[in-house]
Amino acid sequence: MNLVPTVIEQTNRGERAYDIYSRLLKDRIILLGSGIDDNVSNSIVAQLLFLEAEDPDKDISLYINSPGGSITAGMAIYDTMNFIKPNVSTICIGMAASMGAFLLTAGEKGKRFALPNSEIMIHQPLGGTQGQATDIEIHAKRIIDIKRRMNEIMAEKTGQPIEVIERDTERDNFMTADQSVEYGLIDKILERK
């Protein structure tokens, strides 16, 4: 059972109850706190678009604690982050792995953060298929193209040469917050708000 906390806010018109995510959204904070699938992606994209409509000149904060997930769902979030006018600041809390790490690094340069005990993990895309040999070949080519594109984006965002990204994403590559700053995945470790 997934319990969502409720907060009570006093206004001049009385009390108002919000689920915690709606209250955070009021402060332009979005939480990605799960694996990334189509439903999660659609929710994050909708929140980004809503906040842009509310104020296109004010930053949005995306807090990430995610093991990763679907590439296409994650790319929908990535593309929306780049499509909208507001800068999207990313903050790793806990773990940003796989597509979670990709989205963390996709935040606005200079506004990509992690808390001190956060862990970031990068690797190559995972996938699998079955069927006729020709279909398997089609899917294999597709995942190789996705890997190349994601490595190019990661190289651009981190400042690392593409060869370094290719080598370092060959297997699961775990980094501390400090190592992530050195690598260019994030810009700074946040100690206090």
UniProtKB/Swiss-Prot annotation:
Disulfide bonds: none annotated. It is found in: Cytoplasm. It comes from the Bacteria. The keyword Protease applies. InterPro entries: ClpP, ClpP/crotonase-like_dom_sf, ClpP/TepA, ClpP_His_AS, ClpP_Ser_AS. Gene3D superfamilies: 2-enoyl-CoA Hydratase, Chain A, domain 1. Its EC number is 3.4.21.92. Its main location: cytoplasm. One of its GO terms (biological process) is protein quality control for misfolded or incompletely synthesized proteins. The active site is at 98 (nucleophile), 123. It catalyses: Hydrolysis of proteins to small peptides in the presence of ATP and magnesium. alpha-casein is the usual test substrate. In the absence of ATP, only oligopeptides shorter than five residues are hydrolyzed (such as succinyl-Leu-Tyr-|-NHMec, and Leu-Tyr-Leu-|-Tyr-Trp, in which cleavage of the -Tyr-|-Leu- and -Tyr-|-Trp bonds also occurs). Keywords: Cytoplasm, Hydrolase, Protease, Serine protease. It holds the Pfam family CLP_protease. GO terms for cellular component: cytoplasm; endopeptidase Clp complex. One of its GO terms (molecular function) is ATPase binding. SUPFAM superfamilies: ClpP/crotonase. Fourteen ClpP subunits assemble into 2 heptameric rings which stack back to back to give a disk-like structure with a central cavity, resembling the structure of eukaryotic proteasomes. Belongs to the peptidase S14 family. NCBIfam families: clpP, PRK00277.1, PRK12553.1. Cleaves peptides in various proteins in a process that requires ATP hydrolysis. Has a chymotrypsin-like activity. Plays a major role in the degradation of misfolded proteins. ClpXP is involved in the complete degradation of the Site-2 clipped anti-sigma-W factor RsiW. This results in the release of SigW and the transcription activation of the genes under the control of the sigma-W factor. This is ATP-dependent Clp protease proteolytic subunit. It comes from Oceanobacillus iheyensis (strain DSM 14371 / CIP 107618 / JCM 11309 / KCTC 3954 / HTE831). The lineage of its organism: Bacteria, Bacillati, Bacillota, Bacilli, Bacillales.
